[in-house]
């Protein structure tokens, strides 16, 4: 499609050697695969719009996949903070006497109705042919938080880019795809 061709002008797709099988740590049949970019939107309608603009995508369960991109989505918040009772405070169970509870890092737990969606996104994130993850959640603090909670829960270690969408027109989506922002640039939104 024109969006794919435009984004790949003058660029070679990332490639990574992958071992099909190994025996005592030695690769028997090494092969090179083209790495894909996983785009995670905040809601299904946005994922559909992005997939439509990219073009050449096939619906595969609850995500879209093409030669270069996979487009999946959350359903808003998939995780929430664990209840205070889940934290061990001062060698005992939580009580009001222990307030405020300020652990170094808050634990997350899946929202029951969204647990399956989180599990499916985790599978996409861990795919060996996914080289980069793009945050296409809503532009703003809330969208940034939704995405970062997903990354934290799935223990994602892959490079992250930000698709900053302020409009859902095909032209705006194409423009944002050509101007992906770095994860470092978006860090202040998460704090």
Identify the role of each PLM range.
Residues 31-191:
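Intrinsically disordered, low-complexity regulatory segments
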Residues 24-25, 32:
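Mature cores of small secreted peptide/protein domains
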Residues 19-20, 27:
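Cysteine-centered motifs
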Residues 1-2, 7, 22:
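Serine residues within intrinsically disordered or low-complexity segments
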